[in-house]
């Protein structure tokens, strides 16, 4: 009799557990993970946060820019990962520049502004030209640049939104 009662209790426990598990069909969260990347033939990889960047300069005073002022400088870093030792890299920035001003990246939005990028030495980079070779150590390396907004050469600063796109290409030695 005790064996029958025990068997019945075990059976009831299993049935009630199964009923609870089967009755809980509410969505308690789900998601999708997409993976992507690119294999490149280079001595270093580029960290994902460096390969596709967005820099927000916020709201900049028209009168300040009109008096040859500049926006707050923003860091523009290119992180190289898993680098081979004894290599160097030259960076070339490209983009639509202001006519006659190879160091000024033109902006879309008719605001009379330009974006400037400078290297670690503080000198503006010339778009379309290779920068000085930078030595790399084994492992991770970060190439440091600064960027800012200014009145475009021969421009008149106007209110409004602007955008600009610069690309960079790396050449290793």
Give short role names for the model-derived ranges:
Residues 2-7, 19-173:
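Mature extracellular/passenger domains of Gram-negative fimbrial/pilin and adhesin proteins
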């Amino acid at each position: 009799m005790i064996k029958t009662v025990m068997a019945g209790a075990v059976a009831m426990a299993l049935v009630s557990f199964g009923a609870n598990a089967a009755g809980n069909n509410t969505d308690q969260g789900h998601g999708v993970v997409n993976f992507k990347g690119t294999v490149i033939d280079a001595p270093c990889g580029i960290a994902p946060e460096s390969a596709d960047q967005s820099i927000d300069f916020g709201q900049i005073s028209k009168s300040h820019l009109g008096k040859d002022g500049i926006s707050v400088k923003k860091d523009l870093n290119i992180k190289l990962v898993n680098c081979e030792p004894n290599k160097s890299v030259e960076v070339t920035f490209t983009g639509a520049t202001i006519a006659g001003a190879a160091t000024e990246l033109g902006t879309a939005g008719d605001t009379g502004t330009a974006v400037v990028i400078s290297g670690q030495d503080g000198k503006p980079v010339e778009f379309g030209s290779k920068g000085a070779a930078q030595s790399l150590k084994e492992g991770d390396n970060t190439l440091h640049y600064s960027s800012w907004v200014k009145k475009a050469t021969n421009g008149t600063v106007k209110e409004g939104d602007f955008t600009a796109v610069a690309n960079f290409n790396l050449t290793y030695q």
